[in-house]
From Swiss-Prot:
GO terms for biological process: apoptotic process; positive regulation of endoplasmic reticulum stress-induced intrinsic apoptotic signaling pathway; protein autoubiquitination; protein polyubiquitination; response to endoplasmic reticulum stress. It is a single-pass type IV membrane protein. This is E3 ubiquitin-protein ligase RNF183. It comes from Mus musculus. It catalyses: S-ubiquitinyl-[E2 ubiquitin-conjugating enzyme]-L-cysteine + [acceptor protein]-L-lysine = [E2 ubiquitin-conjugating enzyme]-L-cysteine + N(6)-ubiquitinyl-[acceptor protein]-L-lysine. Changing C16S: Decrease in autoubiquitination. GO terms for cellular component: cis-Golgi network membrane; endoplasmic reticulum membrane; lysosomal membrane.
Amino acid sequence: MSEPQGQELRAECPVCWNPFNNTFHTPKVLDCCHSFCVECLAHLSLVTPARRRLLCPLCRQPTVLASGQPVTDLPTDTAMLTLLRLEPHHVILEGHQLCLKDQPKSRYFLRQPRVYTLDLGAEPGSQTGLPQDTAPDTRPVPIPSHYSLRECVRNPHFRIFAYLMAVILSVTLLLIFSIFWTKQFFWGMG
């Protein structure tokens, strides 16, 4: 009985206790063979004074990163993903954000890929409020162009919705017509 509970514990990041997945909690392996989620390692790499060296949160063994190598390039714990029946996604670290680009499953859909980002917080030593010389970003919302409306029509979810609405409207009109026709037919005969 304690064995399945041990597997559950191993399927979680030992730092944040979130279950591993194939997005921002992808298990990454350090040189000491301990696995942590990429979000915790990214936080750790951003607050560590020596950015090229990560100390394992459990055993304190250092993992040396190559010059310019982000923590997202550490090896993924594929055994853990196999145990969870997940396929790995490529997560990248850009500045203080983790980015995940969701690739469409089929090349037949003309949907743009979605990009998910996770903000890891402000830089160490920066102020929490807005600086006085910068105003908040107030860009106007762009009006949808003809091209974006055309892309909306190509969206398979929109097409299914439009077909369903057309079928529902047709069936409703057919029912209304048949009810009035039968009333007129039976009352006209009598």
